């Protein structure tokens, strides 16, 4: 479901109803609702739409909930809700310390200590965001859709753009993981999620665990701890 800032509560409720009907799921049968929004002005709208559709008050993800984590960062209230969910899932399901990598609009890295403390991480432009920016900001570089690279060195402009994005992201992932591991002084588990993760992982030198459902596992965990 695409986030549109001008949509109303009613419009979101109608769209959610349509999506649930396709599954099919009866909205009135929902036991609970959890909202993980990184668009603050829409959080209340989405929560209200969920209540209108299901009759249930939505649980909104934030750092004050029981997530299984402690937050060793300067401003925990400003940590993205999606990052909280990813980190909560990693702390529950994977050996610690752990670094999660979510390859979305932004590529977000979250570091969780061996005591389940959220230590912070890194945020960089996502692969597709970077490719769009370089095309928009130059005269001769075309827009491209990222694809799994066939070779390391790009033999034409499109391949050079694609391989730069793929192998560049992989090199950054490997390099950051090595540095975090050295700083923590312990073996680091690295878990990747997001639609482009399967494209990036084969380009990495490190062992990377792929978990397509990491975010949803985190939301389920937070709901189990707080929503019932």
Task: Describe each region flagged by the PLM.
Residues 1-65:
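N-terminal glycine/serine-rich phosphate-binding loop of ATP-dependent small-molecule kinases
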Residues 1-24, 115-143, 147-151:
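Short glycine-rich, Thr/Ser-proximal phosphate-binding strand/loop in the N-terminal lobe
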Residues 5, 149-189, 196, 207-209:
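Adenine-nucleotide phosphate-binding core of ATP-dependent small-molecule kinases
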Residues 21, 25, 51, 55-56, ...:
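Generic secondary-structure signature for well-ordered alpha-helical cores
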Residues 34, 98-102, 191:
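Short glycine-aspartate micro-motif
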Residues 48, 56-60, 65-137, 166-179, ...:
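Phosphate-binding/catalytic loop of phosphoryl-transfer enzymes
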Residues 84, 139, 166, 198, ...:
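Glycine-rich phosphate-binding/hydrolytic loop that grips phosphoryl groups
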Residues 109, 199-203:
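Short active-site-adjacent structural elements
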């Amino acid at each position: 479901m695409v986030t549109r800032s001008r949509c109303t509560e009613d419009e979101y409720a109608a769209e959610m109803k349509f999506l649930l009907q396709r599954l099919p799921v009866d909205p009135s049968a929902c036991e609970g609702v959890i909202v993980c929004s990184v668009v603050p002005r829409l959080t209340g709208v989405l929560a209200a739409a969920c209540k209108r559709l299901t009759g249930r008050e939505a649980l909104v993800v934030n750092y004050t909930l029981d997530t299984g984590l402690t937050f060793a960062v300067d401003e925990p209230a400003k940590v993205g809700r999606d990052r909280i969910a990813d980190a909560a899932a990693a702390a529950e399901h994977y050996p610690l310390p752990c670094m999660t990598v979510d390859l979305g609009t932004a590529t977000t890295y979250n570091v969780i200590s061996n005591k389940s403390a959220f230590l912070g991480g890194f945020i960089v432009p996502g692969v597709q965001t970077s490719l769009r920016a370089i095309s928009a900001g130059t005269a001769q570089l075309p827009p491209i859709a990222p694809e799994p690279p066939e070779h390391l060195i790009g033999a034409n402009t499109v391949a050079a753009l694609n391989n730069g994005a793929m192998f560049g992201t992989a090199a950054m992932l490997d390099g950051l993981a090595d540095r975090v591991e050295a700083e923590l002084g312990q073996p680091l588990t690295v878990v990747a999620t997001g639609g482009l993760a399967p494209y990036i992982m084969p380009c990495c030198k490190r062992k990377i665990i792929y978990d397509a459902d990491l975010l949803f596992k985190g939301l389920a965990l937070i709901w189990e701890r707080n929503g019932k």
